[in-house]
Amino acid sequence: MPVALAQTPPPTQQPLPASDGNIALSSPSTTLDNGTRFLRHLATEAARAAGAPSQFTPSGGGADLEAAPQTVSAIDNRYRAWFEAYGVRSRMDPRGDFGGDKRRIFGGVAGLGLIIAPGISVGLSVDQSRSDVDIIQYVQSSRIDLTQIGGNIAFESGPWVLGVAAIRGFGDIDSTRGTGAPSVASYGTNLWGALAELSYLWSSGNWRVVPKIGMDWARAESDAYSETGGAVPVNGSEQIAERTRIFGGAEVGYTWLANTMVMDLSVYGRAVDIVSQNVGGLTISPVNGGALPRFIAGVSEDRFGVDTGAILSMRLAPKARLYAVYDGRFRGNFESHAGTLGLEFRW
């Protein structure tokens, strides 16, 4: 009588660990952060560009249109050029399947501005940056080289200034995962953004207070990618992150004369609310099989946050100004500190 042999069931495949996609998961968040910073730069330039140049500081604000020349041909110093170098250190805390990250960003900005009519100005600016990202809980890192091109326009009426800005960014991402013979990938990223901000200037003597309200929108896309090398290289899906924010706050500034140099110091605070957010997610699958695909939810900042900073400006000559800026951004799961050194010329 034949004896039936028991068959061993095939092993059940398990999904890939979420850690295999962490470094790619941080890319849209980092790109959005870069875009938000550049939009803030353009808003500042829009706010201080319209009207009489002598009444503006690097922190923005407004000016009295009645004090400005009333024809384009009569406007002195119609043109502006500025150059900035900046550095940023930030941290996103671990949450869920994401192991958190640390970011170091270095970049430079160059821009040109023009007063096209009394109370109306336009500007064009380019931002080139490099972001180095390290995942806190895993041996994973990436480098994002991002180019952003932005434009702004400012409208001034009395103490009111309305600034509008838009950006377009594109860049390359190179990621490394693991040690020894790591898994590596190279892919592209794209960025779009827009901002509108309304401010009102109140001044008394050397003091000024500038309340501001506004909103911004940004969208970041990271291309699909395929890793090579390493023990378990993976394919990653395209990622899309999009958010809309509203914000409001105020700047307080003071101007004084030190010997023959005009000095200006201002501080600002701003509350931020993310009213709409879709951070999508990432699906990873093994290049060579052997495991099931895995979906990982996207990375986002907490809804409510506070921005704060300070600006010191020194007028080196009637048409040249040097300024230094500190910017801090604080969320429940995210913190960023940035420093900027800039030089502005007018003619």
Language-model regions: role of each:
Residues 122, 237-347:
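Outer membrane beta-barrel transmembrane domains
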Residues 205-210, 220-224, 258-265:
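Short, structured loop/turn "capping" segments at alpha-beta junctions
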Residues 190-197, 210-218, 228, 232, ...:
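Outer-membrane beta-barrel porins/channels
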Residues 5, 9-209, 323-327, 331-347:
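Outer membrane beta-barrel translocator domains of Type V secretion systems
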Residues 166-168, 200, 211-221, 269:
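Short, structured patches in soluble enzyme cores that scaffold and shape functional sites
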Residues 56, 95-104, 133-140, 172-188, ...:
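Solvent-exposed, glycine/polar-rich loop segments of beta-barrel outer-membrane systems
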Residues 201-204, 228, 254-256:
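Alpha-helical scaffolds that organize eukaryotic protein assemblies
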